[in-house]
């Protein structure tokens, strides 16, 4: 329900002028970040093609104006009266009945109402499988709040800025997301690899360094899962991480309330670049703003950014029948490295492995329409971090710059894959802590 990282094309050469930022031209490919217009509104879900009629100019409002507009819209929605009947329901029957009444009254698009019902049933089934004696109570409590927030956003859509900061008050969207995903995790069969390295990262952040986590990406719930696995030992990291997020999770009504609770850099996804062909070039040109926003953040130091250079979620390999990390895009990696290098403060790129696909697996293929089916399960998950990998050390063994970039991307990907296999052995191989290796020390800090 949350994050979809992205990749796309960058105009080249690129020059960003600012009193604080000066960047060299990126490589011939891309960093792959494409910002959303701050005024981008969800398409009419009754017709997935309706967004095509939207003027391209609407996607490119001035950034300064956008920041003010987003703040004003957020302030207005917090004082806007909206139907709160979801919070008053006391049973499943009342909840489902209210969804149907809202749809019949025209307050909910029919497909959003259907998505709400499907989400409720799938969430209920997953939590019941946990064996928690309070499962029914947990389901009703969490789903009433979730549906209340979804309905609020349908009535008064939230507007994301290119750099969105998690909304913690007057309603705490971060805690809401944590509480919603928590019952889906089998903590008895979940693991964190090398937790001491997260402590090292936190120390570097407090020293003013930047850290970029180069990760695979498995589900929309990745940010909540990462935060839940770190909340006991590294709450600062859990709450302050910035995620590079694709446009769909800030447009889909069932995703938006969860995305509101995360720190995001909002981008357009390469996989959806040509969904509306006439907007493709506009999206590419808009990339300058997103680059500038990230560059400004990194220039200030103490930033922790999560990015998936694969450009999307890992998907089931039809030949092997396994979920494996999707390959990284070397040009994306190189441009991220160059942003760090030219930020003016120390920076580190660290490989992070995430295994959680069973919690909320993506569709088997990339879909154009907004509103994918949400399959939800109760399962163990895993997270593992490895030390930063130095580009200079790898480049020293390659005379050809292109070969050095490819080798660096491969080194990061190989580390993620290695850690992923350890997590897989622990969770699905039932080896638990015995799956630890010389490079990955597994722990369960919540026990």
Curated annotation (Swiss-Prot):
Is Transferase included in the keywords of this UniProt record?
yes
| Matches recorded under Pfam families | Acyltransferase, GPAT_N
**Stretches for region Disordered:** 1-21
From the UniProt record, list the reaction(s) this protein catalyses: a fatty acyl-[ACP] + sn-glycerol 3-phosphate = a 1-acyl-sn-glycero-3-phosphate + holo-[ACP]; sn-glycerol 3-phosphate + an acyl-CoA = a 1-acyl-sn-glycero-3-phosphate + CoA
What's an example Gene Ontology biological process for this entry? Answer: phosphatidylglycerol biosynthetic process
Entry GO terms, CC: chloroplast stroma
Q: Which Gene3D superfamilies does the UniProt entry name for this protein? A: Glycerol-3-phosphate (1)-acyltransferase, Glycerol-3-phosphate acyltransferase, alpha helical bundle, N-terminal
**Where in the sequence is the transit peptide found?**
1-48
Sorted alphabetically, which SMART domains does this protein's record hold? PlsC (SM00563)
Q: Which GO terms describe its molecular function?
A: glycerol-3-phosphate O-acyltransferase activity
Intervals of motif HXXXXD motif: 217-222
| Pathway linked to the protein | Phospholipid metabolism; CDP-diacylglycerol biosynthesis; CDP-diacylglycerol from sn-glycerol 3-phosphate: step 1/3
In short, the EC number is 2.3.1.15, 2.3.1.n5
Q: What InterPro entries has UniProt attached to this entry?
A: G3P_O-acylTrfase_chlp (IPR016222), G3P_O-acylTrfase_N (IPR023083), GPAT_N_sf (IPR038114), Plipid/glycerol_acylTrfase (IPR002123)
| Entry keyword set | Acyltransferase, Chloroplast, Lipid biosynthesis, Lipid metabolism, Phospholipid biosynthesis, Phospholipid metabolism, Plastid, Transferase, Transit peptide
Q: Where in the cell is it found?
A: Plastid, Chloroplast stroma
- Respond yes or no to whether keyword Ribonucleoprotein is given for this record: no
- Signal peptide from the UniProt entry: none
Q: Which SUPFAM superfamilies match?
A: Glycerol-3-phosphate (1)-acyltransferase
Its function, per the record, reads:
Esterifies the acyl-group from acyl-acyl carrier proteins (acyl-ACPs) to the sn-1 position of glycerol-3-phosphate. The physiological acyl donors in chloroplasts are acyl-ACPs, but acyl-CoAs are used as artificial donor for in vitro reactions. The enzyme from chilling-resistant plants discriminates against non-fluid palmitic acid and selects oleic acid whereas the enzyme from sensitive plants accepts both fatty acids. Squash is chilling-sensitive. Preferably utilizes oleoyl groups (18:1-ACP) and has lower affinity to palmitoyl (16:0-ACP) and stearoyl groups (18:0-ACP).
Comment, domains: The HXXXXD motif is essential for acyltransferase activity and may constitute the binding site for the phosphate moiety of the glycerol-3-phosphate.
* UniProt record similarity statement: Belongs to the GPAT/DAPAT family.
Q: What is this protein called?
A: Glycerol-3-phosphate acyltransferase ATS11, chloroplastic
- Organism per entry: Cucurbita moschata (Winter crookneck squash)
Q: Which gene encodes it?
A: ATS1;1
